[in-house]
């Protein structure tokens, strides 16, 4: 189901699904007005990977006017052996630091209460995506951090099943919890 409204411009309030899933959190396929970036002091995080997501999602929630372009303006190379996306084991926790910074930005702008459910659902989604795409032994290290503290810190653990948008993702989260209980 398409999340964007059939008219432009629009803003975050007119996106019909999780605002953090309506667009991918990379910046290279988006255009921004310089004045908007400067006015909102938008910056990339200084970390190896996931360094553009805070910029992108901050822009998304702060923008009063968003437009899309249907023309293909860029092509992306995939499966490049030494790319950052293929070597995330070296910076496996960067997504977590982005999620914490995003939550703080939302709070600083008085938006967290309005967007909290989308944020927590995205935090689960992005945590699981990172977990599912890492290799061992980093994958186990991430699972231990998620279950040991990060799911609590991100507000995921305190939520009932019906709070989550995606049943499959919630099921994977519960399976992860049950796996840990069974091992003890």
Model-found features: residue ranges?
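Donor-binding/catalytic cores of nucleotide-activated saccharide
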Residues: 1-69, 74-89
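Residue-level recognition of alpha-helix termini/interfacial anchor residues
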Residues: 40, 111, 115-116
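Catalytic core of nucleotide-sugar-dependent glycosyltransferases
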Residues: 71-80, 85-112, 126-156
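Short, charged, amphipathic alpha-helical segments
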Residues: 114-121, 144
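Membrane-interface aromatic/basic loop that binds lipid-linked glycans or pyrophosphate carriers
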Residues: 136-184
